[in-house]
């Protein structure tokens, strides 16, 4: 196996985790799929599949969810960058989600600082 093939993840081969975080038990969040693509990321489920576990010094993960599925407000001890690859997403900030709202479309990118409560739909 070549060095590159060990570090390749094809979209159709992504293995989702539907219980990576505690909020997936909340009504409205139960259809979210999380992916740990490079590194273990910030997932709370130790059984989540890590696609590329080779140490890189950074993590890349992903989320996929149907319209109307809410990712409840949360914060991380890491910065988070979102790249919208499909659909429209609304990002909210603040503990209650009412400090700011940003609508994002395909191709838009946002960097969210650590310790900032954020959620998305």
Residue ranges and their predicted role:
Residues 1-57:
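A short, N-terminal "cap"/entry segment at the start of jelly-roll beta-barrel domains
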Residues 41-48, 59-76:
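Conserved short histidine dyad/triad with adjacent acidic residue
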Residues 48-53, 70-76, 93, 101-103, ...:
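Short histidine-centered beta-strand/loop micro-motifs
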Residues 55-60, 78-79, 88, 107, ...:
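Extracellular structured ligand-interaction cores
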Residues 62-63, 73-75, 79-84, 102, ...:
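His/acidic/aromatic-lined binding-pocket segments of jelly-roll/cupin-type domains
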Residues 66-67, 77-90, 94-95:
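Glycine- and acidic-residue-biased ligand/ion/polar-headgroup-sensing regions
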Residues 69-72, 90, 109-110, 114-119:
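Histidine-centered metal-chelating micro-motifs
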Residues 95-115:
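Short acidic-glycine-tyrosine-enriched beta hairpin
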């Amino acid at each position: 196996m070549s060095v590159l093939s060990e570090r390749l993840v094809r979209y159709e081969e992504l293995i989702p985790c539907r219980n990576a975080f505690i909020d997936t038990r909340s009504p409205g969040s139960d259809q979210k799929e999380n992916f740990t693509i490079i590194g273990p990321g910030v997932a709370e489920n130790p059984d989540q599949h890590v696609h590329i576990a080779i140490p890189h010094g950074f993590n890349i993960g992903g989320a996929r969810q149907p319209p109307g599925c809410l990712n409840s407000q949360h914060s991380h001890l890491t910065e988070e960058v979102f790249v919208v690859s499909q659909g429209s997403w609304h990002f909210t900030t603040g503990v209650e989600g009412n400090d700011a709202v940003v609508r994002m479309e395909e191709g838009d990118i946002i960097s969210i600082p650590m310790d900032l409560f954020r959620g998305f739909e």
